């Protein structure tokens, strides 16, 4: 819901693909700068507390968005008001950088390792369900009641999440001997470099984030200018991606933990091919079908990538490794900004389609020339 409302609102205000990239970049920079610190924090402090604090911050940000729209400032009548969305994006980036490593690293602390893949898949499926319903609901709420209503609903949902996290079991940090944070971050990098399996998993995971994820923030261009379906159509497109994600989550949750690296690579290829077709499609039905395939590929890669990292990383390094993994979302912001510039310079279809073609090439190379990696469980 938040992504549909925020991206379509800034495109409404500025009518600029570059600004779509800029709003994502505003959150990406804090993630790139602070994620490593967030990983060290996750290894030092109770993860449950960090998660709760992040929900408080998100509640306040969405509340501020809603108020800014309600008083008539964050609207097309005030084209300079885009700074509110960028400021909020920066704050959200800080929150994500400090809390997301804890969100990811807490799973192995409350679930047995042999059930880790299933737990991650079910967790992903839950998020995918909201991605299925949320965007479409957001589109119709915006069309019927305005942007402020969506932002207030998001604020309320995050407030409810604070209550739900109270029921999480309390976990203690794995690391007992505390060192200098800078040294811990350096140790995290050294650990990844010295473990080729973890390094390769992160490399192909970041390739998907950097080259494929920009389509989400550029979706208003396709919905408004190419397919001409408006904000309701954008919500429906994103919901179809959520439907594919749920289908993939159900399948992956039931699969044995075998050749998961191959699943990661094949998921990247599926997502890349679907994005190429979507980028150049002017057919509404074909675009919907491709969004389903994008969702399947995205969740297939995301779930297996997370499970592989958490399976092959020693517990005392997991928070830091997951924080480095979170850097990928910062890189996604850079990729989105670059895609936005490309969209303004050449076209949105060639920006998204071209990046997807690179992802397909990289993944095919790994499938053919890295047999040892594709056999990793």
Label each PLM-derived region with a short phrase.
Residues 33, 44, 48-50, 64, ...:
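C-terminal transmembrane bundle of multi-pass solute transporters/carriers
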Residues 170-203:
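Juxtamembrane intracellular "pre-TM" segments in multi-pass secondary transporters
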Residues 11, 64-68, 72, 76, ...:
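MFS-fold secondary transporters
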Residues 1-6, 25-42, 46-61, 84-143, ...:
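Substrate-agnostic recognition of the 12-TM MFS/MFS-like secondary transporter fold
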Residues 7-13, 66-75, 133-153, 225-226, ...:
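Transmembrane alpha-helix termini and helix-breaking/packing motifs in multi-pass membrane transporters
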Residues 1-30, 190-239:
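Helix-loop boundary and gating motifs at the non-cytosolic
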Residues 105, 109, 147, 151, ...:
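Helix-loop junctions on the cytosolic side of multi-pass membrane transporters
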Residues 60-88, 233, 332:
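Short, flexible, glycine-rich and Lys/Arg-enriched loop motifs at helix boundaries
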